Amino acid sequence: MCIRDRNHAKEFDSNGDGKADMVACHPGWGCEKIISRHFEELGLGEFINPIKADYSAAMADIISRYKNGKSVLFYTWTPNWTVGTLKLGEDVVWIEAPFSETKVVSVPNATKSKLNMGFGVNDIRPAANVDFLKANPKVEKFLKKASIPLADIAAQNLKMNKGEKSEKAIKKHAEEWIKANQKTFNSW
């Protein structure tokens, strides 16, 4: 499927203008600049409308469209609540960008086994005050070993998106995760 084919673009059109509608990044986000560059360099503006509204609100519309049997196109990342709602490999797949700032990578739940993601891959790592870590070497050792699966982080993000975002609720999420993964947690 080529989004530059107007017949395919219409499948993702929600406002009737014949262009695909794609939830992009909120104005001011770093990813907005990369998406804008992709649109400019690839001439995508003729075929796709980037929706730059509030990301959560725009994604709520995408999810509703998907649940109503419509085709959807959106920018996302992991971990993120969106992939906790629209499951990668079941509901949606990663699609390839024509180029990327980084090398081609193996990506599960994609249109093919190795592809250009269009964006550099980010790592999630803990950060802490240097003086605190010097005073607490066991904490530093713990943080170096700790690793939570992206799917679990996305699931927790989904809970927050559904309203469970108070400090008390987030602490409960952490306690539940630790209890369900006690052996792994203890190994850290």
Label for each model-derived stretch:
Residues 4-23:
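A conserved helix-loop-strand patch within extracytoplasmic ligand-binding domains
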Residues 24-30, 131:
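Short coil/turn segments
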